[in-house]
């Protein structure tokens, strides 16, 4: 749970204090964004960890018609069929929704909560903002939530969710302070705090392996590859809402 570095812009000028009001706002902790495809880990985890699918399960990734709304697509392309791991690798929207449907909203919401997306992280900073999410029992909302829209989360919540995957499925409380010195000499460490187990060790390790393949040369995150290192992650397209409605 230790945070080694965290930055936010714009910041204020330390010499003139110009921009102090704007610079005091910490975007990583206090701002909310639709996470986009980075959120597909919840769809995959809910189905795999609950036994409804494996990473080798084939998923139909053709457009999914949603009554009363626009279909879920990968426009302008269509992948046809992909494994669950392939859905992450290629970042298929209809694939993610069909995976989420295997678990259903109640189970999906359980893992949504276990990942920490329904509560503040508890970081030792003031003013932390909690997420906002549409009612997923509504089919249209569920179709959008499954690939990261119709909800808003903080960058820190997303970071801690991915940290749980790296930590074999255990979600930690984030902390900026390792400890304090009492009387300038006695160091009192701040112990790490486990919040909960969000998935089995096997699911976490298999998911981690799938995220490594997202950086393959035919994955969506190939530019994140670093020679000599195993790099895992998930691409995502964040849309910002216009004040007048719609997206930038």
Where are these regions (language model features)?
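Beta-lactam-recognizing serine transpeptidase/beta-lactamase-like catalytic domain environment
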Residues: 2-37, 42-248
């Amino acid at each position: 749970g230790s945070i080694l570095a965290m930055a936010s812009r714009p910041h204020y000028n330390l010499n003139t204090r110009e921009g102090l009001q704007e610079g005091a706002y910490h975007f990583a902790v206090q701002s909310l964004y639709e996470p986009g495809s980075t959120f597909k880990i919840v769809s995959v985890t809910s189905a795999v960890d609950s036994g409804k699918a494996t990473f080798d399960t084939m998923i139909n990734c053709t457009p999914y018609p949603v009554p009363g709304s626009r279909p879920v697509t990968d426009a302008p392309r269509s992948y046809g069929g992909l494994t669950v791991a392939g859905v992450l690798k290629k970042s298929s929207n209809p694939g993610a929704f069909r995976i989420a449907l295997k678990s259903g909203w109640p189970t999906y919401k359980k893992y949504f909560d276990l990942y920490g997306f329904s509560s503040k992280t508890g970081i030792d900073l003031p003013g932390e903002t909690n997420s906002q999410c549409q009612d997923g029992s509504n089919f249209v909302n569920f179709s959008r939530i499954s690939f990261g829209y119709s909800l808003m989360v903080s960058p820190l919540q997303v970071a801690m969710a991915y940290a749980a995957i790296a930590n074999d499925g255990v979600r930690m409380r984030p902390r900026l302070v390792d400890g304090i010195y009492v009387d300038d000499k006695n160091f009192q460490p701040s112990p790490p705090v486990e919040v909960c187990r969000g998935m089995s060790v096997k699911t976490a390790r298999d998911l981690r392996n799938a995220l490594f393949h997202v950086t393959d040369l035919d994955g969506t995150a190939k530019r994140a590859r670093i020679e000599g290192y195993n790099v895992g992650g998930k691409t995502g397209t964040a849309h910002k809402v216009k004040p007048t409605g719609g997206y930038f």
